[in-house]
Swiss-Prot record:
Keyword Cell wall biogenesis/degradation (UniProt): yes
Modified residues (2-(S-cysteinyl)pyruvic acid O-phosphothioketal): C117
HAMAP family: MurA
Places the protein is found: Cytoplasm
Positions of the catalytic residues: C117 (proton donor)
Binding site for phosphoenolpyruvate: K22, N23
E.C. number: 2.5.1.7
Keyword Metal-binding: no
Pathway: Cell wall biogenesis; peptidoglycan biosynthesis
Protein name per Swiss-Prot or TrEMBL: UDP-N-acetylglucosamine 1-carboxyvinyltransferase 2
Function in brief: Cell wall formation. Adds enolpyruvyl to UDP-N-acetylglucosamine.
Gene: murA2
Length: 418
């Protein structure tokens, strides 16, 4: 196991290249196995643990998978197995996309109940409701989900709550369904649009992605295609927030600025300077930022995945800030770690009341989940003194080469074996 050792206090300067969106890539790889002809060549795939696990799972199903740097080739023409009941699947949330993909292509699927970050109850009831509405029978037993259908028939599906995962999974399952499927109260995140665009590039007929009503007209088959995944808005947000916390000036390259509007708006409100280009964002910060209130919401609102990094920044900003985590009820576990470094934060349910302190002090802390890990890296970079961050396997699930990228910006950070 590894840990990160950070000697904080350095401002950040330079530029950083953002990789492909984790949340898009972990759905696009399962989508690729739905092609019965041709090879999919997918560019801008991040080199992170969740992707490596998915590559192993779909290889075990009979696909041929080849990675060259950030490009992954998938040949699913000889895929025969529908049993994705693997240990890798139990360690990541996105393994559930294999249910929709396999059910859509073969009419049956067997997948290990998904794992991922311990940030609260993450039920798949909306997924199951949708699969059953299409005509599938779904059973959950001994940690495994099994779905089966003689034929999937398009229908209208209304999500009781806005769910990114259910929206994507039902898009996958509906691609081959007879007739038209309408998803109402659908999530609108950029990676949902990206998955729909990928499926359409393979021959699907999906309209309305990015709105709250998505229509999928069933097609007979999909063919492999060439595609490039959108940039990762949360990775970009992490480097923006880190620059604001440490001070300095950093250009974040290979981004879609529109996807970062909710982040940029809050950082500007706090006092940071932000300039946007077609595919970059430059942030300049002299620290001494003022606190703000945030509430996490589905896109285009403030993203829950950026809440924990932003909480770190607010802990060293002037005045009081209120953070309302409205998406996941257990996504404030990082607060106890920030307190070890001197943060003044009180948690009431899913609300954090943050009174900014002048500085944080280095300490031994742990990454309790993926985005909490990013929050602790930012805290350590901004703190006075040395910090050690353990449990960084969570960080590796979503941030490629995080220590190398921060080193390039002038941070004193290194990875060590425990």
């Amino acid at each position: 196991m590894d840990k990160l050792v950070v000697n904080g206090g350095n401002p950040l300067f330079g530029s950083v290249e953002i990789g492909g969106a984790k949340n898009a890539a972990v759905a696009i790889l399962p989508a690729a196995i739905m092609a019965s002809e041709g090879i999919s060549v997918i560019d801008n795939i991040p080199d992170i643990q969740d992707i490596q696990r998915l590559e192993r799972i779909i290889t075990s199903l009979g696909c041929k998978v080849k990675r060259v740097q950030n490009t992954v080739e998938i040949d699913s023409t000889n895929l025969t197995s529908v049993n994705a009941d693997t240990e890798d699947g139990s360690k990541m949330r996105a393994s559930y996309y294999l249910i929709g993909a396999l059910l859509g292509r073969f009419g049956k699927a067997k997948v290990e109940l998904p794992g991922g970050c311990p940030i609260g109850v993450r039920p798949i009831d909306q997924h199951i409701k949708g699969f059953e509405a299409l005509g599938a029978t779904v059973k959950i037993s001994h940690g495994t989900v099994e779905a089966q259908a003689d034929k999937l028939i398009g229908t209208n599906i209304y999500f009781d709550v806005v769910s990114v995962g259910a929206t994507i999974n039902l898009m996958l399952a509906s691609v081959f369904a007879e007739g038209t499927t309408v998803l109402e109260n659908a999530a609108k995140e950029p990676h949902i649009v990206d998955v729909a665009n990928f499926l359409n590039s393979m021959g699907a007929n999906i309209k309305g992605a990015g709105t709250d009503v998505i229509r999928i007209a069933g097609v007979e088959k999909l063919k492999g295609c060439n595609y490039s995944v959108i940039p990762d808005q949360i990775e970009a947000a992490t480097y923006m927030i880190a620059t604001a916390a440490c001070g300095g000036c950093v250009t974040i390259k290979n981004v879609i600025p529109k996807h970062l509007e909710s982040i940029s708006a809050k950082l500007i409100e706090m006092g940071a300077d932000i300039k946007e280009g077609d595919d970059y964002v430059t942030i300049e910060s002299h620290k001494n930022l003022k606190g703000v209130n945030i509430k996490t919401l589905p896109y285009p609102g403030f993203p829950t995945d950026a809440q924990q990094p932003m909480s770190t920044l607010l802990s060293i900003s002037q005045g009081r800030s209120i953070v309302n985590e409205s998406i996941w009820e257990s996504r404030l576990k990082h607060v106890d770690e920030l307190k070890k470094m001197g943060a003044n934060i009180k948690v009431e349910g899913t609300v954090a009341i943050i009174d900014g302190v002048e500085k944080l002090t280095g300490a031994n802390v742990k990454a309790t989940d993926l985005r909490a890990g990013a929050a602790m890296v930012i805290a350590a970079l901004a703190a006075e003194g040395v910090s050690e961050i353990s449990c960084i396997e969570h960080i590796d699930r979503g941030y490629p080469h995080i220590e190398d990228k921060f080193k390039e910006l002038g941070a004193n950070i290194r990875r060590e074996k425990i």
